Each structure stands twice: as C-alpha cells, then as structure tokens.
Swiss-Prot record:
Keywords: DNA replication, DNA-binding, Primosome
Domain SSB, first and last residues per copy: 1-101
GO biological process, one term: DNA replication, synthesis of primer
Function: Involved in the restart of stalled replication forks, which reloads the replicative helicase on sites other than the origin of replication; the PriA-PriB pathway is the major replication restart pathway. During primosome assembly it facilitates complex formation between PriA and DnaT on DNA; stabilizes PriA on DNA. Stimulates the DNA unwinding activity of PriA helicase.
Gene name for this UniProt entry: priB
Protein's organism: Photobacterium profundum (strain SS9)
GO cellular component, one term: primosome complex
MF annotations from Gene Ontology: single-stranded DNA binding
Signal peptide span: none
Full protein name: Replication restart protein PriB
UniProt cross-references to SUPFAM superfamilies, sorted A to Z: Nucleic acid-binding proteins
NCBIfam families: PriB_gamma
Family membership noted in the UniProt record: Belongs to the PriB family.
Known partners and oligomeric status: Homodimer. Interacts with PriA and DnaT. Component of the replication restart primosome. Primosome assembly occurs via a 'hand-off' mechanism. PriA binds to replication forks, subsequently PriB then DnaT bind; DnaT then displaces ssDNA to generate the helicase loading substrate.
Amino acid sequence: MTNRLELSGVIAKDPKRSQSPAGVPHCHFVLEHRSYQREADLPRQVYCYINVVSSGKGLQVLTQDLAVGVHTKVAGFISYQTGRNGIGKLVLHADHIEIICSGD
C-alpha cells in the first residue's frame, strides 16, 4: 500500500520539541499550505492546515531553524491520531524536511 505525501507551505505554529521516554527526539509543528491547482480543467484555490511530526536524531538538526513564517517542504507518511480530548486528526510523519525560504 502506498502512503506518501509531499507538501510545501508555511510554518503556522511554533514548533514544539519533546523527547520520548526512550530518548527519541520529536518536533511537532503545523504546516499551512495555499496554492492553485487544476481540477476538471478549471483553476481551484487549495488550502490545508496539517499537523506534522518529525522524529529521530537525523531530523533533529533540520528542525532547528523551523519557526513561524518559514517556508518549508515536508515529505513523509500520514497517519490518524486521536488526541487526549478524543478528537482525531491526520498527522504527517515527516522523514524529509527542506527549508525553502526563511520567514525573515
């Protein structure tokens, strides 16, 4: 089964860094994507807001420069997660992060 998503956008919320009990570093942030796509030969404005998590020491260096307003491209797989409040959401588990342009 294929499960791969690549999305570019702007960091919309300050990244939150944490570490699992096993010592695995995590970085959670929200990516806001806006673009125009073609559907049925017509232009369509597209918008999405997705939670992203990157895990592992290999990605830790790449997340150091992430901040609100930074244009970023992420790739990875998506998974459904249920929060403590019982509300579910799709989360992009990034295995590739590329800063396109800083927010300065």
